[in-house]
């Protein structure tokens, strides 16, 4: 596959949208069934990803946000992490997209930013997840859905222990510029992205477009490409 980094600051790259809603309409439960579908019904996952390709996206994002050891252990699937990783990347690679990104979300473990043991435990979650994808055909990792700078820092450190691939990092930001945890600002997350070697600085917001553009300009102060995600809330006046 082409080196995605050669396209940074040159091309506008569009990432695929989450396929979980598509799978949910087919009867899959979002909590656990997505991993099941990846293994047992890969055709359903491939069909959902194919819809994104038909829409013209350049980057297919694997349905792997919940594939950290702690989250898989909660579903009794921790030992199947390597198998799940291979299946997820295979589903995307079969469609021959321009690029494949592996998504990892927050690991879900409690995090005490003042405790070295807690930080190491969280960091290890992401390192172990990244190791499961070693040797597979991917162009980078996508750290998505993070709500605190400390959690994001652990994720970045964990990935950098294992991989030199590009890392897209994204945090959830409110209209007021605060992260979803309500205690830290977007600027703190950007500082962490710069310090811990993110390749792309990103955010996801439900804010109006004008406010989202302000967040994008804030992120653009870093010497990194900017990833903007708009979380469009369903409008049902009834």
Predicted feature residues:
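Domain-level signal for soluble alpha/beta catalytic cores
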Residues: 1-238
């Amino acid at each position: 596959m082409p080196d995605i980094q050669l396209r940074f600051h040159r091309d506008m790259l569009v990432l695929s949208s989450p396929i979980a809603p598509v799978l949910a309409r087919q009867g899959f439960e979002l909590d656990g069934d997505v991993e099941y579908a990846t293994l047992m019904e890969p055709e359903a996952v491939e069909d959902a990803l194919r819809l994104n390709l038909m829409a013209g996206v350049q980057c297919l994002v694997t349905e792997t946000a919940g594939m950290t050891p702690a989250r898989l252990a909660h579903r009794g699937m921790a030992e199947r992490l390597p198998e799940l990783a291979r299946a997820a990347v295979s589903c995307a690679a079969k469609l021959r997209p321009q690029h494949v990104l592996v998504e990892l979300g927050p690991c879900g473990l409690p995090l005490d930013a003042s405790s070295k043991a807690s930080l190491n435990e969280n960091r290890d979650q992401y390192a172990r997840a990244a190791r499961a994808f070693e040797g597979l055909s991917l162009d980078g990792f996508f750290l998505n859905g993070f709500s605190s700078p400390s959690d994001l820092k652990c994720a970045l450190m964990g990935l950098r222990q294992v991989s030199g691939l590009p890392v897209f990092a994204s945090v959830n930001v409110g209209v007021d510029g605060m992260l979803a945890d309500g205690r830290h600002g977007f600027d703190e997350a950007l500082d962490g992205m710069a310090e811990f070697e993110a390749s792309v600085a990103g955010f996801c917001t439900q804010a109006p477009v004008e406010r989202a553009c302000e967040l994008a300009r804030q992120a653009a102060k870093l010497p990194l490409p900017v990833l903007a995600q708009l979380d469009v809330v369903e409008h049902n006046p009834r």
